[in-house]
């Protein structure tokens, strides 16, 4: 069981597209594995978040605001995982499906969870001089998401998968930014 979990993480990190074709990964245990991967990456994400906040404070860009406590960060991150999966499901399955697309929401949710595996390497960002590594890890995450979405939605090219995978976080981030700006006004 733990071996299967590690196998999923390693195959996702290696961008192995056969991970997403294996029906055994989409059973009930697959959903729980993806949930555990997301929670682990959220816990690890606190390291670069703290480094980023201290860097922003040194530059004078973060003044007086308190960072999110862990419970709120966990809840918000799980909510964003769910919203991102809904967005990818609606756009990829309902709006722009391929003729061979036969996918349910749970499969998309599980795939997005598996794609979070490269974010485990965020623990390496422990110093502000390493902050640019977040970009590399994020590109790796988007690549894993593109491979997964391309396989489960049976797209012929990866451009469609990239647009769906990359636009979802951008729309969510922009929406949250607008929401927080309106709340602070």
Predicted regions and their residues:
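Selected alpha-helical membrane-embedding segments in polytopic membrane proteins
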Residues: 1-103
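Hydrophobic alpha-helical transmembrane segments and adjacent short intramembrane/lumenal linkers
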Residues: 89-176
